[in-house]
């Protein structure tokens, strides 16, 4: 009996506890990411943004949560009720599930699997199903058009993201996310004998792929200027037209969880994860998770500034950028990186 508990029960209980702790921390982080998104947008437009609920509006997201929870959900008469309610649940569940393999620090990961990057890529590819289900089940033209746009957009830019990941894997030689971070301990800064660890990270050696990944992440998460699936001026609110109350909140939660996931993935692949930017004792003393959160927050700030400054693309421009620019460019970079690694013997 003791062997049974030590082999199955306690490890399962510990994993459940870790998952709940990560879930609570992630939901709190998403609440303040949403607030930061609104504050940054307001600052660019010379407005104050949310500033009533709590000091500096810090509790605005929790007030919105209460508002959504206590509103009555209205289901359209012609909608498929089961799929209509299941769609936001699928969206938010998949967006949160991918965080199981994200290492926030050395050994701070729920499931340190050897194919972690493949798991994240697969989960992010499945998120489009929640949007398609919601658009189809609404039995309305605007949601259906938004869902079709989303499916085409996500499929188009997943190809480029896949090639970017292949390029990083060629340099690292592992699918494990922890190994990808640890591989960024050695690079240009180390070769030059400088303590500038940020020169070792992949953002410098793979700069074109860093730009492609960042822009493709915007398209993958339906962020402006690629928010065609929910374009307010064209499709009212896209696939979320018929949603309100808690289902709408779950779609929003899934969207921002996916955005935070892409910020974390950018941090891991290109910005050194939890590694400090300069290798000195004072910065090495700072916990790695602090560096991880700061870097992910910086990436999200870039997401928010793009939303504030860049106008929305037309649909044909979006498709042209994905298939005629990013796809051949990322494919060429894969070939170039593989050739350089083979030529120099770094592989």
UniProtKB/Swiss-Prot annotation:
EC assignment: 7.1.1.-
Organism expressing this protein natively: Rhizobium meliloti (strain 1021)
Family statement: Belongs to the complex I subunit 1 family.
Subunit relationships: NDH-1 is composed of 14 different subunits. Subunits NuoA, H, J, K, L, M, N constitute the membrane sector of the complex.
Protein name, per record: NADH-quinone oxidoreductase subunit H 1
Annotated HAMAP family: NDH1_NuoH (MF_01350)
Residue ranges crossing the lipid bilayer per the database entry: 14-34, 50-70, 83-103, 115-135, 161-181, 198-218, 258-278, 286-306, 321-341
Membrane topology (UniProt): Multi-pass membrane protein
Highest taxon in the source lineage: Bacteria
Protein role: NDH-1 shuttles electrons from NADH, via FMN and iron-sulfur (Fe-S) centers, to quinones in the respiratory chain. The immediate electron acceptor for the enzyme in this species is believed to be ubiquinone. Couples the redox reaction to proton translocation (for every two electrons transferred, four hydrogen ions are translocated across the cytoplasmic membrane), and thus conserves the redox energy in a proton gradient. This subunit may bind ubiquinone.
Entry GO MF terms: NADH dehydrogenase activity; oxidoreductase activity, acting on NAD(P)H, quinone or similar compound as acceptor; quinone binding
GO biological process, one term: aerobic respiration
Keyword Transport in annotation: no
InterPro entries, A to Z: NADH_UbQ_OxRdtase_su1/FPO, NADH_UbQ_OxRdtase_su1_CS
Range of residues in the leader sequence: none
Catalysis performed (reactions): a quinone + NADH + 5 H(+)(in) = a quinol + NAD(+) + 4 H(+)(out)
Compartments where found: Cell inner membrane
GO CC list: plasma membrane
């Amino acid at each position: 009996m003791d062997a049974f508990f030590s082999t199955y029960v306690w490890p399962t209980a510990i994993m459940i506890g870790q998952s709940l702790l990560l879930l609570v921390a992630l939901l709190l982080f998403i609440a303040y990411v949403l607030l930061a998104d609104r504050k940054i947008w307001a600052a660019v437009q010379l407005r104050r943004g949310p500033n009533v609920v709590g000091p500096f509006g810090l509790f605005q997201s929790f007030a919105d949560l209460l508002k959504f929870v206590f509103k009555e959900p209205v289901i359209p008469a012609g909608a498929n009720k089961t799929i209509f309610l299941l769609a936001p649940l699928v969206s938010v569940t998949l967006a949160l599930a991918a965080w199981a393999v994200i290492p926030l620090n050395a050994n701070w990961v729920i499931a340190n699997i050897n194919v972690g990057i493949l798991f994240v890529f697969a989960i992010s590819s499945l998120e489009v199903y929640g949007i398609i289900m919601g658009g189809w089940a609404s039995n309305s033209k605007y949601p259906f058009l938004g869902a079709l746009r989303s499916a085409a957009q996500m499929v188009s830019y997943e190809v480029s993201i896949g090639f970017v990941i292949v390029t990083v894997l060629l340099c690292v030689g592992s699918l494990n996310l922890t190994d990808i971070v640890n591989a960024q301990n050695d690079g240009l800064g180390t070769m030059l004998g400088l303590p500038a660890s940020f020169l070792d990270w992949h953002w410098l050696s793979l700069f074109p792929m860093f730009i492609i990944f960042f822009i493709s992440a915007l398209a993958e998460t339906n962020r402006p200027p690629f928010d065609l699936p929910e374009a307010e001026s064209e499709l009212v609110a896209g696939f979320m037209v018929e949603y309100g109350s808690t289902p709408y909140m779950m779609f929003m939660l899934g969207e921002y969880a996916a955005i935070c996931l892409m910020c974390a993935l950018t941090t891991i692949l290109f910005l050194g994860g939890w590694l400090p930017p300069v290798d000195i004792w004072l910065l090495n003393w700072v916990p790695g998770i602090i560096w991880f959160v700061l870097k992910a927050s910086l990436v999200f700030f870039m997401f928010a500034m793009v939303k504030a400054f860049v106008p929305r693309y037309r649909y044909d421009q979006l498709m042209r950028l994905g298939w005629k620019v990013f796809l051949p460019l990322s494919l060429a970079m894969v070939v170039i990186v593989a050739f350089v690694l083979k030529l120099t013997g770094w592989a």
